[in-house]
Regions:
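Short, glycine/acidic-enriched loop or turn micro-motifs at the edges of active sites
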Residues: 139-140
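Short beta-strand scaffold segments in enzyme catalytic cores
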Residues: 143-147
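Nucleotide/phosphate-binding catalytic cleft detector across ATP-hydrolyzing
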Residues: 1-135, 152-154, 163
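Catalytic P-loop NTP-binding/switch module of NTPases
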Residues: 166-167
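Residue-level detector of high-confidence beta-strand sites
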Residues: 156-158
Length: 167
């Protein structure tokens, strides 16, 4: 058996979770995938720097002309599309070091997932995610947390304080 692609997770206080509300004028009054892509690019541009890498960009919710709670706005009509977006970033050096280790094992990273998100997906029921949950995962050296509401991931982070510092 040869493993050539690996999904890795990062648990580091260098993880940042930023929330944005991006407004995009709707061309031709009907929302297209291009309008949504433009909003994502605008959110990602606010996170571009030499020392950070974008791990994940996730939509949290859509609204058209002030009407909220739209699941999929493509094909709907309006003048202004607002998208709430979560952008997860990490220090570039951490991702480069992970990539180096994986490449030295003759494999490639297929996806990077942040630990707080992975913990939540592995442990939360759909009811818990829908009702709203803050999942706290305390390890020896770090404590990670993720926030879910209405079944949607909202925010995450990692604190450099773990069980070793408390007990």
């Amino acid at each position: 058996l040869t493993v050539d692609k690996i999904v890795v997770n990062i648990s580091s206080e260098a993880i940042e979770s930023n929330l944005y509300e991006i407004s995009v004028p709707i061309k031709d009054t009907q929302v297209s995938k291009k309008d949504i892509e433009t909003a994502f690019m605008n959110a990602e541009e606010q996170n571009v720097s030499d020392d950070k890498v974008i791990i994940e960009t996730m939509p949290l919710g859509f609204s058209i002309d002030g009407v909220r709670s739209i699941e999929d706005p493509v094909g709907m009509y309006g003048k202004k599309l607002d998208i709430n977006i979560s952008v997860i970033t990490c220090k570039r050096s951490i991702v480069q070091n992970l990539n180096n280790v994986i490449e030295n094992a003759h494999a490639k990273i297929s996806k990077i997932i942040i630990s707080p998100f992975a913990s939540a997906i592995a442990t939360l029921s759909s009811d818990e995610a829908n009702l709203g949950t803050i999942l706290i995962d305390m390890g020896a050296g770090t404590t990670s947390y993720s926030v879910f509401s209405d079944g949607i991931f909202k925010y995450a982070g990692v604190s450099p304080i773990g069980g070793n510092y408390i007990t």
